[in-house]
């Protein structure tokens, strides 16, 4: 047998224990930490967004997104806690209520909150797309009533699609433990799960709740980035300037939109594939457990962190956050001072480079003009040897107190003669030169 075959056999023989280990690490240690970060962040965001300062329609979508993500983090934390208790000898699996929660609520609530968050992001991206691409129609189209209807629809669509999942996906089973003299409740796959009609429902649900939002987000955000690029080029052509602070903010927004698209693709597609493939047989395989753990962690991380990404790019949000939590003002001020120092340093370096280039040009002009003056003086001296100096010129030279015994023309006279055609320039020290 080849080495690869031996390794494959070894993995398959130890896969149940290894799969359980992977599941314990992912769901008992990693996911609770991510959920804690998401819960703290979204509660903070709801407190900040409750301010009167942030009453624009766009912030309605952000508040709805915070609610959906907060519910998702809470549902995941409850799921992880109950699974941990059930696997570590707790009596929680001896209650019928826990079986009802496992079969009909546990995964349904998590997936409903995830789907609602995704559709809220779609509604927010659509609002942003109309404001950028169709600014003339945005004022009449955008209203709190329309935003409220969009948010309600975003929460209703996943709920409707997950009703059959909640009712028929799993069935309850029970066994009597003779050692403990108690009834143990658990869940198992329902037979309807293998039927053709269920497969149609499953693929339709995942296509509408997972893949369709990813496609919509990708198309909308790409269109927004293209519109920003066109606006940047138009601005640069009209003003004939290089990139400044405004265009740098546009670049930051485009990077944020591109990151949103990338996060949607990377974090949501594996989770969608996982929901299409999952069954009790696959759960015993090590490779599937690794894929499932990574997919779930990516999806939860996306929903725990995407609100930070949206709000970190809003100046109004940061200002309101510092008003709500003044203890962070010192750190924020220190960071601003550091950024200001870096910007000033870069500006000084660029200015010094520009001044050095200008000074070199001016020195070259001075050297060129000095060479021309020396050449003119030399020709004048040659001309004076052959032509006598007129009396009035000598009188002027003597009256000015300059020596004329050498027969040389003074440089001041040359400047007077040619000053009418020479261009005088002043440098930064008010030094005049040709």
From Swiss-Prot:
Give the membrane topology, semicolon-separated if more than one: Multi-pass membrane protein
The portions of this protein that span the membrane are: 30-50, 65-85, 105-125, 147-167, 208-228, 258-278
Signal peptide annotation: none
| Alphabetic keyword roster | Cell membrane, G-protein coupled receptor, Glycoprotein, Membrane, Receptor, Transducer, Transmembrane, Transmembrane helix
As one GO molecular function, the record gives: G protein-coupled receptor activity
Coarse class of the protein's main subcellular location:
membrane
Asked whether the UniProt record includes Metal-binding among its keywords, one would answer no
Positions glycosylated per UniProt = 12, 88, 181, 429-430
Q: InterPro entries recorded for this chain? A: GPCR-like (IPR053093), GPCR_Rhodpsn (IPR000276), GPCR_Rhodpsn_7TM (IPR017452)
Identify the GO cellular component terms for this protein.
plasma membrane
The places in or outside the cell where this protein is found are:
Cell membrane
User: What is the documented function of this protein?
Assistant: Not known. Putative receptor.
Would you identify the family this protein belongs to, as annotated?
Answer: Belongs to the G-protein coupled receptor 1 family.
Q: What is this protein called?
A: Probable G-protein coupled receptor B0563.6
Per the UniProt entry, what species is this protein from, by scientific name?
Answer: Caenorhabditis elegans
């Amino acid at each position: 047998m080849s080495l690869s075959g031996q390794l494959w056999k070894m993995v398959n023989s130890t896969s149940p224990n290894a799969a359980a280990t992977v599941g314990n690490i992912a769901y008992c240690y990693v996911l609770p930490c991510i959920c804690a970060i998401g819960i703290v962040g979204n509660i903070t965001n709801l407190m900040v967004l409750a301010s009167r300062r942030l009453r624009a329609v766009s912030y309605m979508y952000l508040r709805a997104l915070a609610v959906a993500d907060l519910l998702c983090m809470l549902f995941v934390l409850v799921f992880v806690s109950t699974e941990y208790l059930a696997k570590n000898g707790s009596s929680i699996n001896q209650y019928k209520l826990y079986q009802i929660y496992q079969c009909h609520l546990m995964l349904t609530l998590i997936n409903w909150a995830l789907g609602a968050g995704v559709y809220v992001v779609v509604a927010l991206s659509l609002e942003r797309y109309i404001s950028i691409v169709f600014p003339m129609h945005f004022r009449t189209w955008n209203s709190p009533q329309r935003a409220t209807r969009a948010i309600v629809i975003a929460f209703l669509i996943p709920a409707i699609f997950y009703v059959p999942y909640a009712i028929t996906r799993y069935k309850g089973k029970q066994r009597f433990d003779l050692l403990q003299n108690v009834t143990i409740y658990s869940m198992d796959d329902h037979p309807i799960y293998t039927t053709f009609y269920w497969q149609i429902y499953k693929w339709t649900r995942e296509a509408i709740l997972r893949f369709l939002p990813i496609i919509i987000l990708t198309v909308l955000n790409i269109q927004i980035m293209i519109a920003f690029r066109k606006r940047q080029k138009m601005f640069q052509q009209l003003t004939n300037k290089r990139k400044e602070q405004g265009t740098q903010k546009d670049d930051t927004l485009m990077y944020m939109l591109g990151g949103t698209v990338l996060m949607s693709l990377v974090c949501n597609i594996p989770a969608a594939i996982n929901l299409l493939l999952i069954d009790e047989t696959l759960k015993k395989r090590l490779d599937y457990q690794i894929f499932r753990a990574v997919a779930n962690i990516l999806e939860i991380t996306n929903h725990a962190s995407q609100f930070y990404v949206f709000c970190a790019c809003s100046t109004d949000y940061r200002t309101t956050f510092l008003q709500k939590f003044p203890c962070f003002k010192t750190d924020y001020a220190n960071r601003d001072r550091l950024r200001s120092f870096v910007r000033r340093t870069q500006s000084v370096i660029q200015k010094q480079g520009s001044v050095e280039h200008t000074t070199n040009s001016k020195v070259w002009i001075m050297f060129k003009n000095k060479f021309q003056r020396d050449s003119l003086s030399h020709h004048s001296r040659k001309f004076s040897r052959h032509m006598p100096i007129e009396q009035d010129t000598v009188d002027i030279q003597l009256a000015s107190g300059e020596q004329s015994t050498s027969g040389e023309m003074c440089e001041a006279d040359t400047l007077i003669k040619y000053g009418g055609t020479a261009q005088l320039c002043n440098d930064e020290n008010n030094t005049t030169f040709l």
